[in-house]
């Protein structure tokens, strides 16, 4: 079975991802709708946060995180830089999330295209794999909606940026390390939405190739395993 249209695929990617990937496989333009959806919801979460948060509180939080190991002179420069850019942070963040999504998809599309060559019957183009990657990033929509809900339901405007944007991180949910810890940034970057994306990648690879479940899971998880494995080794040194 496959999704009959792009709008159905936007729902199916969450409740029946194989239908979404089967529909996307030979469709034209569907992935643009997914990219636009991710971008708009992500930008909305950023805009709502910056429109709500106490900027001085945010500046202090960002300064505390960025100046853990800094000298007094470096701390002054860091605070000055943060304060100078405070007014444009919202626009920088919104542009960055869109460009970041596009760049990550571009890199991962190359990876998927290369590993798909292990299946002699797979003949998908780079553009097809680019669209494929966009659909594996769709959990970011749920993440952004969660951020919006946390911001709008907050009882104060002194809202932690890390708490609302990384609420699904392993560090926030389980470990609870403080800034300055060797593994803090790593565990803040490892999120449930990322693991969800790996699962979607596995389902998609099974739909688009003849890979077994185990092989599809391995290939979907491999980039994350390599990146976080190297990161963990460096953090432990």
Question: What is the predicted function of each stretch?
Answer:
Residues 1-15, 85:
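Short, membrane-interfacial amphipathic segments enriched in basic
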Residues 2, 92-93, 179-184:
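Short juxtamembrane and helix-loop transition motifs at transmembrane-helix boundaries
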Residues 6, 19-23, 27-142, 148:
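Selected alpha-helical membrane-embedding segments in polytopic membrane proteins
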Residues 12-13, 49, 64-69, 117-124, ...:
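Short, exposed beta-strand "edge-strand" segments with a Pro/Gly-rich flavor and a Y/T-containing core
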Residues 15, 109-113, 198-200:
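A generic alpha-helix surface/boundary motif
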Residues 127-237:
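Hydrophobic alpha-helical transmembrane segments and adjacent short intramembrane/lumenal linkers
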């Amino acid at each position: 079975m496959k999704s009959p249209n792009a709008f159905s695929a936007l729902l199916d990617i969450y409740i029946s991802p194989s239908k979404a990937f089967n529909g996307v496989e030979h469709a034209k333009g569907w992935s643009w709708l997914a990219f636009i959806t991710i971008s708009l919801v992500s930008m909305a979460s950023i805009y709502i946060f910056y429109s709500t948060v106490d900027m001085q509180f945010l500046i202090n939080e960002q300064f505390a995180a960025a100046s853990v190991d800094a000298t007094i002179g470096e701390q002054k420069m860091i605070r000055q830089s943060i304060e100078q850019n405070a007014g444009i942070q919202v626009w920088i963040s919104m542009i960055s999330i869109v460009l970041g999504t596009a760049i990550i998809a571009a890199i991962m599309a190359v990876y998927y295209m290369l590993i798909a060559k292990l299946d002699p019957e797979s003949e998908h183009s780079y553009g097809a794999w680019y669209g494929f990657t966009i659909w594996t990033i769709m959990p970011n929509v749920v993440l952004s909606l969660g951020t919006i809900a946390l911001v709008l339901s907050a009882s104060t405007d002194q809202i932690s940026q890390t708490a609302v944007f990384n609420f699904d991180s392993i560090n926030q949910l389980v470990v609870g390390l403080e800034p300055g810890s060797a593994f803090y940034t790593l565990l803040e970057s490892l999120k449930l939405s990322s693991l969800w994306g790996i699962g979607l990648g596995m389902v998609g690879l099974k739909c688009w190739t003849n890979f077994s479940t185990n092989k599809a899971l391995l290939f979907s998880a491999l980039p994350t395993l390599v990146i976080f494995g190297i990161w963990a080794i460096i953090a432990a040194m």
